[in-house]
């Protein structure tokens, strides 16, 4: 999905993300079992590493990183990571972790798919679990993706009901399947809630260029958009400045502009990370597609809390969203997976 090479920075203070250094795993000394004693050998922490092509503030890698920090606290893993790794350096970093005794390596392979798969094949005893547009490969390369089209659809319902100009927009990264399906799901919901809406779509050609995303959002607002899907960082800032409404993406970003951000689809990588870590710990790891762990029914995605908007959203809008969410969770309704180029009216 991602081939980011943009080094634009945004204020790291905006994101509640600690840059604390990862502690080295505290390995308990193995206790030799005396003949007939039954003493157990203390287990060493599972060594896990992540390799990210972008800064960890970027939404996609941020969510993976947050889940791995959670695994460090809850599952006791020894976690290290490398961020903003250029494509040309990806192979070296992967090899460094694999040769250093890392048992599970995660991250996004979109910037270096061929290299990541090649290195995985050369270290068959190391589990590789990467965001990828391809499938798993035996014996050790597993994949996942951000299947958050379901909450994106729910956000579209809200946008369709809340627009006053009958014009909604989306500023997104690139016209690739993983992005297109989110924008199309958003539009599906918006059209269902309001058949009269027009749609404005802009791709900025980067996964991390907040100034460019803001510029694109301002152009859409000037064209009449009054509810915008902020698929990339930078859009919410424009929406706040111009007094329109925004839908965030990947994480709960309400704190950036509480009066602007109604909600947004949240990608929770915890179910995926938990499943992968437990498999490796149990010695039961096999090459798999972990994609299903990102669906709402698995807890891998959900609608961000309304926060202050809970009191401001009309009751009929909240009921519409709640009813549709229930049908998604019970399996009686499926959101379309449309990876074609999103429309722009």
Regions found by a protein language model. Name each.
Residues 47-72, 80-88, 110, 175-181:
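Extracytoplasmic "Venus flytrap"
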Residues 282-345:
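Hinge/cleft segment of the Venus flytrap/periplasmic-binding protein
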Residues 1-17, 24-35:
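N-terminal secretory signal peptides
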Residues 75-83, 195-207:
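Short beta-strand elements in bilobed, periplasmic/extracellular small-molecule ligand-binding domains
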Residues 121-145, 250-259:
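Flexible loop/hinge segments that line or gate small-molecule binding clefts
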Residues 102-109, 129-131, 223-233, 249:
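Periplasmic-binding protein-like
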Residues 136-158, 170-175, 258-271:
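Short beta-strand elements at the ligand-binding edges of bilobed clamshell
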Residues 68, 154-197, 201, 289-313:
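An alpha-beta-alpha
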């Amino acid at each position: 999905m991602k081939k980011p090479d943009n080094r634009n920075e945004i204020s790291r203070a905006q994101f509640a993300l600690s840059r604390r250094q990862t502690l080295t795993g505290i390995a308990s000394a193995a206790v030799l079992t005396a003949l007939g004693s039954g003493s157990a050998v203390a287990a060493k922490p599972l060594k896990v590493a992540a390799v990210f092509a972008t800064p960890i503030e970027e939404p996609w890698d941020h969510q993976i990183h947050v889940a791995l920090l959670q695994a460090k606290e809850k599952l006791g893993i020894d976690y290290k990571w490398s961020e903003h790794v250029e494509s040309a350096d990806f192979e070296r970093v992967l090899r460094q972790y694999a040769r250093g005794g890392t048992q599970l390596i995660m991250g996004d392979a979109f910037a270096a798919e061929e290299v990541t798969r090649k290195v995985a094949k050369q270290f068959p005893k190391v589990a590789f679990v990467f965001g990828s547009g391809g499938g798993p490969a035996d014996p050790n390369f597993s994949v996942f993706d951000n299947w958050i089209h379901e909450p994106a659809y729910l956000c579209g319902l809200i946008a369709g009901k809340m627009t006053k100009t009958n014009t909604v927009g989306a500023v997104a990264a690139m016209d690739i399947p993983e992005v297109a399906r989110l924008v199309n799901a958003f539009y599906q919901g918006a059209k269902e809630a309001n058949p009269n809406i027009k749609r404005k779509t802009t791709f900025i050609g980067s996964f991390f260029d907040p100034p460019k995303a803001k510029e694109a959002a301002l152009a859409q607002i000037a064209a009449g958009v009054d509810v915008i899907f902020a698929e990339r960082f930078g859009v919410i800032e424009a929406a706040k400045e111009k007094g329109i409404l925004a839908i965030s993406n990947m994480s709960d970003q309400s704190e950036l502009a509480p009066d602007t951000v109604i909600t947004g689809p949240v990608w929770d990588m915890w179910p995926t990370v938990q499943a992968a870590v437990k498999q490796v710990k149990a010695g039961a790891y096999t090459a798999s597609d972990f994609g299903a762990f990102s669906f709402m029914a698995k807890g891998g995605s959900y609608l961000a809390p309304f926060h202050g908007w809970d009191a401001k959203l009309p009751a009929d809008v909240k009921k519409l969203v709640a009813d549709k969410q229930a049908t998604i969770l019970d399996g009686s309704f499926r959101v379309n997976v449309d990876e074609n180029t999103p429309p722009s009216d």
